[in-house]
């Protein structure tokens, strides 16, 4: 009995010692510091790569980090953790301008992924693919694709200022609960979400293709700004918040055949090759403002029953204002109607302050939010190179 008690006590003490040795916040300044992890499959705390590191670091053995794995302003050249499969909090690599190789070949789960100002990093190094993450930020890298990300759902998904990023294809993603923003990547960037069914806010800027064949419902803004595609389609979209198409210089066709409700404003502005606006045959309700300006010759919304805000239609061409006046006279358009043909400089609505009892404001304010956020993210990302 005494021997049994002794063994139990010894094992308990050993367990506590082991737990203590594999816990806390660890700062790594060289490869020798990694020896602290040599007997730890699980590290309970954060691991931080110091700014003084100027070579490669290999975290062999550790399989799980309950906290974060971080590096900021470090001169690390290679980071390897081939056995690491889970990071409980953040994988954050920021302003590591010498980092050229990332090997996290077993990683499948991380809470937040943040890769910022990594100008030499060309591949993610997620061989098994990361399938769980709540937030992703990738900005100012040399990545050519996002191969290694295979998420089904995500919160925020920000990808900006990656000059060689040519393709984003997230096959399994079905839902985006936060804000998605793609901006200022390679001009040939093709974005494909073949199975995405729902999203909160999404903005696409400077992309050559955006494929959303399964998108069914948006809760917030769906915006397309300064893109290079000729055609854009969301064949299964039935409802969205604000819907914006601005300064898409090559677009000639917009098709959303099942869209019935815009809970906010609908704006099409400065799409210089868009002559015929006929891609919304089922649209019935716009709770905010309707704002269409450009060089269009045709506007057809045959199912429209209600516009709760103002309606502004201005074109350099003749498109016919009589049908719109009839909609105003029949109270389909609840706010102010501005309809002008053959305008040298068509103007967008100055103050689309319409909306419904739920507080949906008109186009002008809502349309400005996402572009401003995108520009701020892009600016902050670029600024990191100089800090």
Curated annotation (Swiss-Prot):
<feature type="region of interest" description="Disordered">
    <location>
        <begin position="338"/>
        <end position="362"/>
    </location>
</feature>
<dbReference type="InterPro" id="IPR051648">
    <property type="entry name" value="CWI-Assembly_Regulator"/>
</dbReference>
<feature type="glycosylation site" description="N-linked (GlcNAc...) asparagine">
    <location>
        <position position="236"/>
    </location>
</feature>
<keyword id="KW-0732">Signal</keyword>
<feature type="glycosylation site" description="N-linked (GlcNAc...) asparagine">
    <location>
        <position position="206"/>
    </location>
</feature>
<keyword id="KW-0336">GPI-anchor</keyword>
<feature type="glycosylation site" description="N-linked (GlcNAc...) asparagine">
    <location>
        <position position="73"/>
    </location>
</feature>
<keyword id="KW-0472">Membrane</keyword>
<dbReference type="GO" id="GO:0005576">
    <property type="term" value="C:extracellular region"/>
</dbReference>
<feature type="compositionally biased region" description="Basic and acidic residues">
    <location>
        <begin position="338"/>
        <end position="361"/>
    </location>
</feature>
<dbReference type="GO" id="GO:0031505">
    <property type="term" value="P:fungal-type cell wall organization"/>
</dbReference>
<protein>
    <recommendedName>
        <fullName>Cell surface GPI-anchored protein ARB_01627</fullName>
    </recommendedName>
</protein>
<keyword id="KW-0325">Glycoprotein</keyword>
<dbReference type="Pfam" id="PF12454">
    <property type="entry name" value="Ecm33"/>
</dbReference>
<dbReference type="GO" id="GO:0009986">
    <property type="term" value="C:cell surface"/>
</dbReference>
<feature type="lipid moiety-binding region" description="GPI-anchor amidated alanine">
    <location>
        <position position="364"/>
    </location>
</feature>
<feature type="glycosylation site" description="N-linked (GlcNAc...) asparagine">
    <location>
        <position position="175"/>
    </location>
</feature>
<feature type="propeptide" description="Removed in mature form">
    <location>
        <begin position="365"/>
        <end position="387"/>
    </location>
</feature>
<keyword id="KW-0964">Secreted</keyword>
<dbReference type="GO" id="GO:0098552">
    <property type="term" value="C:side of membrane"/>
</dbReference>
<keyword id="KW-1003">Cell membrane</keyword>
<comment type="similarity">
    <text>Belongs to the SPS2 family.</text>
</comment>
<comment type="function">
    <text>Required for proper cell wall integrity and for the correct assembly of the mannoprotein outer layer of the cell wall.</text>
</comment>
<feature type="glycosylation site" description="N-linked (GlcNAc...) asparagine">
    <location>
        <position position="201"/>
    </location>
</feature>
<dbReference type="GO" id="GO:0005886">
    <property type="term" value="C:plasma membrane"/>
</dbReference>
<keyword id="KW-0449">Lipoprotein</keyword>
<feature type="glycosylation site" description="N-linked (GlcNAc...) asparagine">
    <location>
        <position position="231"/>
    </location>
</feature>
<keyword id="KW-0961">Cell wall biogenesis/degradation</keyword>
<feature type="glycosylation site" description="N-linked (GlcNAc...) asparagine">
    <location>
        <position position="270"/>
    </location>
</feature>
<keyword id="KW-0134">Cell wall</keyword>
<dbReference type="InterPro" id="IPR032675">
    <property type="entry name" value="LRR_dom_sf"/>
</dbReference>
<feature type="signal peptide">
    <location>
        <begin position="1"/>
        <end position="19"/>
    </location>
</feature>
<dbReference type="GO" id="GO:0009277">
    <property type="term" value="C:fungal-type cell wall"/>
</dbReference>
<feature type="glycosylation site" description="N-linked (GlcNAc...) asparagine">
    <location>
        <position position="253"/>
    </location>
</feature>
């Amino acid at each position: 009995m005494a021997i049994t008690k002794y063994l139990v006590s010894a094992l308990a003490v050993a367990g506590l010692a082991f737990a203590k040795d594999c816990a806390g916040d660890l700062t790594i300044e060289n490869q020798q510091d990694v020896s602290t992890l040599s007997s730890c499959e699980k590290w309970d705390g954060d691991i931080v790569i110091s700014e003084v590191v100027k070579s490669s670091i290999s975290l062999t053995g550790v399989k799980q980090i309950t906290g974060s794995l971080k590096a900021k302003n470090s001169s690390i050249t290679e980071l390897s953790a081939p056995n690491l499969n889970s990071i409980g909090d953040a994988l954050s690599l920021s302003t590591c301008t010498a980092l050229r190789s990332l090997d996290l070949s077993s990683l499948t789960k991380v809470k937040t992924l943040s890769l910022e100002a990594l100008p030499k990093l060309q591949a993610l190094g997620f061989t098994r693919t990361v399938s769980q993450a709540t937030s992703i930020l990738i900005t100012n890298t040399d990545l050519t694709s996002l191969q290694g990300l295979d998420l089904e759902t995500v919160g925020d998904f920000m990808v900006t200022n990656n000059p060689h990023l040519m393709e984003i294809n997230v096959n399994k993603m079905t839902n985006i609960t936060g804000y998605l923003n793609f901006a200022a990547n390679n001009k040939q960037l093709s974005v494909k979400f073949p199975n995405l069914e729902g999203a909160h806010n999404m903005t696409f800027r400077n992309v050559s293709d955006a494929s959303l064949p399964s998108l069914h419902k948006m809760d917030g803004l769906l915006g397309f700004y300064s893109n290079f595609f000729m055609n854009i389609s969301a064949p299964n979209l039935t409802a969205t918040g604000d819907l914006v198409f601005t300064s898409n210089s090559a677009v000639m066709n917009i098709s959303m055949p099942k869209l019935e409700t815009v809970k906010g404003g609908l704006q099409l502005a400065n799409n210089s090759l868009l002559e015929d606006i006929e891609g919304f045959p089922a649209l019935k309700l716009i709770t905010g403002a309707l704002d269409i300006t450009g060089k269009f010759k045709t506007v057809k919304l045959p199912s429209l029953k209600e516009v709760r805000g103002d309606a502004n239609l201005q074109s350099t061409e003749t498109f016919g204002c009589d049908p719109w006046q009839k909609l105003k006279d029949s109270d389909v358009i609840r706010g102010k109607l501005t309809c002008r043909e053959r305008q040298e400089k068509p103007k967008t609505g100055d103050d689309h302050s319409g909306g419904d009892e739920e507080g949906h404001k008109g186009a002008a304010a809502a349309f400005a939010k996402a572009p401003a956020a995108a520009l701020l993210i892009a600016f902050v990302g670029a600024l990191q190179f100089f800090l």
